[in-house]
């Protein structure tokens, strides 16, 4: 992927950009295998890595704003160079950024100066849906002082960018390296951006996590769906469920595969906004026996009784943050004894440790998903079966 910013040294976010893609994949696959070398790998069906397109794959831009209000600079937080033509973004983002620069000037959104601790506009967060090209635009501001000016100029912005579905101000008053604050002021009637992967509607909300590589994310969810649809299960837990991507894909596939069977899904996620999005997706799919709750996934699980056999899930899906599920939850899952565990991880090192603690389970399938080309990061999906 040619990138003038990398060549000039303006941005080194893509630290492996000079490495051939086949070599990138080989290094990631080797790293993944190293994390599992302490386990019994004799029964693993290794799937070929799921590859990504190499540019234009990101659906989200997180731009720090600096410079002057008449000529704002939109860059990555670690760079001071204008990066609006970053090749990781779709090519049409460049024109959108041009329109947003003009809006910043018209609304008087003075870029926040970190050294002087003055100014208002800290970040612009732009997300695009692959469903219909709809956009969610968020301005991260220090205060609400510019709200009247933003409201005054908003009709002009919507006329220039009719694909804008959700526009909001996020208020982050602290002088700290924090991306966003708690308060979200919506300027549009619509508060969620609809996406669709594999005929499963998903909803992106402000302050909620959503994968930034939709092509690979769709493959990740679709693979989980494919692995699960033939399993003899009808009760599912989806821990750390986010907006419900894994659980809904699996529940819908099982319901289609076994139309006479009642498929029960319980999804747990600490983010209330993500739970709202997941509930909306379940309603749109018409799934009846689905319950999403805003709770700490670990605390929820540990509060359950492994002896309550009637309610024991046959499949537990875990998609934890980088720290993994930890020893305590792994030991609980050994006691709970679901037939299968589907583990999706963004950190193979902690996943390897977790699977080692899932001593009652045998790894059956493993696949790497290259969600972040040109970097050392990747995601991995594993299917474990009770021994």
Swiss-Prot record:
InterPro entries, per the entry: 23SrRNA_MeTrfase_RlmC, MeTrfase_TrmA_AS, MeTrfase_TrmA_CS, SAM-dependent_MTases_sf, U5_MeTrfase_fam
Residues that coordinate or bind S-adenosyl-L-methionine: 211, 240, 269, 319
GO biological process, one term: rRNA base methylation
Molecular function as annotated in GO: 4 iron, 4 sulfur cluster binding; iron ion binding; rRNA (uridine-C5-)-methyltransferase activity
Domain of life: Bacteria
A Pfam family that the UniProt record links to this protein: tRNA_U5-meth_tr
UniProt entry keywords in alphabetical sequence: 4Fe-4S, Iron, Iron-sulfur, Metal-binding, Methyltransferase, rRNA processing, S-adenosyl-L-methionine, Transferase
Disulfide bonds: none
Chain ranges passing through the membrane: none
Catalysed reactions, as listed in the record: uridine(747) in 23S rRNA + S-adenosyl-L-methionine = 5-methyluridine(747) in 23S rRNA + S-adenosyl-L-homocysteine + H(+)
Record-annotated active site: 346 (nucleophile)
Binding-site positions, [4Fe-4S] cluster: 3, 11, 14, 86
PROSITE patterns: SAM_MT_RNA_M5U, TRMA_1, TRMA_2
Enzyme Commission code: 2.1.1.189
Function: Catalyzes the formation of 5-methyl-uridine at position 747 (m5U747) in 23S rRNA.
Similarity-based family: Belongs to the class I-like SAM-binding methyltransferase superfamily. RNA M5U methyltransferase family. RlmC subfamily.
HAMAP family: 23SrRNA_methyltr_RlmC
Protein name: 23S rRNA (uracil(747)-C(5))-methyltransferase RlmC
Organism (species): Pasteurella multocida (strain Pm70)
């Amino acid at each position: 992927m040619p990138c003038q910013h990398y060549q000039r040294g303006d941005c080194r976010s893509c630290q492996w950009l000079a490495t051939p893609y086949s070599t990138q994949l080989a290094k990631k696959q080797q790293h993944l295998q190293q994390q599992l070398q302490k386990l019994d790998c004799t029964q693993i069906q290794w799937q070929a890595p799921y590859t990504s397109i190499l540019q234009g794959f990101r659906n989200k831009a997180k731009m720090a704003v600096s410079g002057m209000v008449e000529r704002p600079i939109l860059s990555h937080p670690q760079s001071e160079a204008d990066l609006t033509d970053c090749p990781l973004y779709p090519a049409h983002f460049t024109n959108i950024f041009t329109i947003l620069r003009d809006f910043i000037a018209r609304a008087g959104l003075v870029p926040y100066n970190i050294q002087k601790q003055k100014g208002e506009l800290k970040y612009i967060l732009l997300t695009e849906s692959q469903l219909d090209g709809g956009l969610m635009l968020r301005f991260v501001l220090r205060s609400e002082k510019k709200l009247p000016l933003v409201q005054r100029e908003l009709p002009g912005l919507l006329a220039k960018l009719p694909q804008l579905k959700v526009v909001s101000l996020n208020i982050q008053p602290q002088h700290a390296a924090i991306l966003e604050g708690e308060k979200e002021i919506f300027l549009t009637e619509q508060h969620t951006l609809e996406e669709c992967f594999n005929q499963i509607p998903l909803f992106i909300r402000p302050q909620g996590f959503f994968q930034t590589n939709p092509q690979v994310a769709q493959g990740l969810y679709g693979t989980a769906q494919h692995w699960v649809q033939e399993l003899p299960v009808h009760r599912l837990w989806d821990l750390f469920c986010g907006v419900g991507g894994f659980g809904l894909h699996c529940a819908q596939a099982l319901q289609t595969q076994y139309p006479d069977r009642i498929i029960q899904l319980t999804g747990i996620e600490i983010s209330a906004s993500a739970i709202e999005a997941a509930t909306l997706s379940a309603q749109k799919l018409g799934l009846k026996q689905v319950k999403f709750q805003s709770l700490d996934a670990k605390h929820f699980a540990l509060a359950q009784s492994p002896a309550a056999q009637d309610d024991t899930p046959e499949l537990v899906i875990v998609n934890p943050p980088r720290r993994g599920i930890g020893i305590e939850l792994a030991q609980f899952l050994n006691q709970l004894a679901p037939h299968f565990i589907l583990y999706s991880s963004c950190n193979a090192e902690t996943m390897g440790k977790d699977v080692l603690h899932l001593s009652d389970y045998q790894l059956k399938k493993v696949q790497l998903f290259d969600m972040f080309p040109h970097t050392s990061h990747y995601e991995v999906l594993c299917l474990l079966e009770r021994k």
